[in-house]
Amino acid sequence: MKKIQKINLAVFLAFIVFTIPLSYVLGSDFMGRQEKPWHMQGSVHEDSLSQEYLGKYKILDKVPVTLQVERSKEKRVLILIDAWGVPFDEKKMAKEFAIFKDVPHEYAIHKRLKNVTKHAELVEFRTDSTESIVAIEKLSRLDSLLMNSDYKTVALTINDSKEGSEESLRNVLNDIAELMKKFPDVQFIVQGAHRPILGTPETRREYYAHWVPVVIGNF
């Protein structure tokens, strides 16, 4: 191999050695600045509740709510509401909680590990073998069931709000509040199953990823 060829080869190899790491660094930086698809994006501080929430509400950890709330009545109703989450805007949360202001209540925020309704049902509706429990599908059945049965615990998942409609959610909350007033001797534990996930990406990003509201009524 001629001397000039050796020099050219050495220059070429040096160029390759230099450009490969540089292209990796620049490429990584470029990719890091690209906007990810909505399902890969995390909300800002999505798992860190604001000081406003921490100072105003009782915070329940990832242990099932039903194990953290003492039974205060002979009968108890456990309600999961699909797509009821904790918004970054605390004032919005306060308006939803205020629907229950006319019944004895306690508000709380609960850590929910997964955004899946079935997971919430498995976690919250587990019961001791000595305790009778019945699961129903419609809120309209609850009235007659509480009046005409001896069940100690009734469990219900409400899907009316699963599409993320705020109007549907408020209607559901109002109906539950009216039942609390009608049955003051029944303890109600109402909580979100997970944040809204079927709406627009913008709507999803308005909520904490793994926190849900809890209302304990007639406690």
Tell where the protein language model's regions lie, with residue ranges:
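Transmembrane and membrane-interface helices of multi-pass
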Residues: 1-39
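Intrinsic disorder/low-complexity signature
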Residues: 5, 26, 36, 44, ...
